[in-house]
Design a protein with these regions (language model features):
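Conserved donor-binding/catalytic core segment of Leloir-type glycosyltransferases
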Residues: 4, 153, 189-215, 226-227, ...
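Membrane-proximal helix-turn-helix segments that form the acceptor-binding/catalytic region
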Residues: 22, 77-87, 103, 107-111, ...
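N-terminal strand-loop element at the rim of the active site
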Residues: 5-14, 23-73, 159-166, 174, ...
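A short, well-ordered alpha-helix in the C-terminal region of glycosyltransferases
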Residues: 328-331, 335, 342-356, 368
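Conserved acidic donor-binding segment of nucleotide-sugar-dependent glycosyltransferases
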Residues: 314-315, 319-326, 335-340
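Acidic donor-binding loop of glycosyltransferase active sites
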Residues: 265-283, 298
Length: 376
């Protein structure tokens, strides 16, 4: 069975695609990858991608500020380049990652008479960054080509319901962005105090400002420490606000490599996974951090969106915030700090979540279906 894994970036920094490649290879699947040479292309890091990779390159004239008409021509050029790269691989199955690869994948599949898996990492047309003619074009592409695929995959049950209802298709298979079994880490070497961690890229809608503000409300609990690990556009603003509050229990840790996130998280006591539903895409998503914290054995304080509720009702591994406010966060932090029995139950259940929901188990379900297509 030959699978062509298709993505519209330079592959090496896309964690979901890299996990796909590794799991295909672990299951003795002949996997090749097709991508696009983008601004993050790194020749040295490409050597770490464990399968053959073909990177298409869009024409130079489209690598500059473009008019609306030129944007359309750039899209046609991008689809053409991806399609040609896929055709050169002659796969049995095309695994199209996200909407921006779907058109090329379906066009190539028609010529090759092969199967297509559409793996939607998000609800692209409902992303707050998708606007104007670009949004209309993508909505048209999804509506047209989603009827031509053989299987759809998405990252949450809430998103699966959305796609099923919107396009009247078979309910997509849910394969969450969970962690690898091998990444599971438990640590008795905890940081001082009761440390509550939010790690990732510092940008709006992810709760970093909320937890920093909560520090002002937690001064009567000096053992509770608010920790942030990462980088991003909000860092200066967050540091400034922490200084204004004057609470020394707000800690900023430097960023670490992706494969170090879980071991470092295991040194904290609680994880934070806040997604503010500023658009439908965010509302129907699931925070990858939940699975990272669970793999580190941490209870989680999380926002009230459908998939977080679904997971917590099933596994009872943390607290769903009533509202995304410093006041509600303070209540959750104090509950986990003062109620040791509740904390221990949540920690045990987080461990169970990571045991039952891991990448190897999740992705093997798709590989089984793909084998049935090829083997008849």
């Amino acid at each position: 069975m030959r699978v062509c894994d298709v993505v519209s970036n330079s592959v090496w920094y896309d964690p979901r695609v890299r996990k796909q490649i590794v799991e295909y290879m672990n299951n003795n699947v002949d996997v090749v990858c097709v991508g696009l040479k983008d601004h993050r292309y790194d020749e040295e890091k490409m050597k770490n991608v464990p399968c053959p990779v073909t990177l298409a390159d869009i024409d130079e004239k489209y690598k500059k500020p473009l008019s609306k008409v030129e944007v359309l021509f750039k899209e046609f050029n991008r689809v053409k380049k991806l399609r040609e790269a896929i055709l050169s691989q002659k796969p049995d199955i095309i695994h199209a990652n996200d909407l921006d690869t779907l058109t090329a994948a379906c066009q190539a599949a028609k010529k090759l008479d092969c199967k297509v898996v559409y793996d939607s990492h998000e609800i692209c047309v409902e992303n707050h960054q998708m606007r104007g003619i670009y949004k209309k074009l993508n909505a048209l592409c999804e509506k047209t080509f989603i009827k031509r695929i053989n299987k759809m995959v998405c990252v949450s049950h809430a998103a699966a319901d959305y796609f099923e209802n919107k396009y009247a298709i078979e309910k997509p298979m849910v394969i969450t962005n969970c962690s690898l079994k091998a990444e599971k880490t438990a640590s008795n070497d905890k940081h001082d105090g009761f440390e509550i961690l939010n790690h990732g890229v510092y940008y709006g809608g992810r709760g970093y400002d909320i937890i920093v503000e909560s520090a002002a409300l937690l001064k009567d609990y000096p053992e509770i420490k608010i920790a942030l690990r990462g980088f991003g556009a909000m860092e200066d603003e967050l540091r400034k606000r922490a200084e204004e509050i004057g609470n020394e229990n707000v800690i900023f840790y430097p960023p670490v490599l992706v494969n170090e996130l879980i071991p470092y998280a295991s040194k904290s006591k609680v994880g934070v996974a806040i997604t503010e539903n500023t658009c439908l895409n965010f509302e129907l998503s699931v925070s990858n951090k939940i699975f990272e914290y669970a793999s580190a054995g941490l209870p989680v304080i999380m926002s009230d969106i459908p998939e977080h509720r679904y997971l917590n009702e099933k596994y009872n591994f943390g607290i769903i915030l009533k509202e995304n406010t410093p006041e509600c966060f303070k209540e959750a932090a104090i509950k986990l700090y003062t109620d040791k029995e509740f904390y221990d139950v949540c920690a045990k259940n987080a461990d169970r979540l990571s045991e039952e929901v891991n990448w190897e188990t999740e992705f093997s379900r798709l590989i089984e279906i793909e084998r049935s297509w090829v083997n008849g």
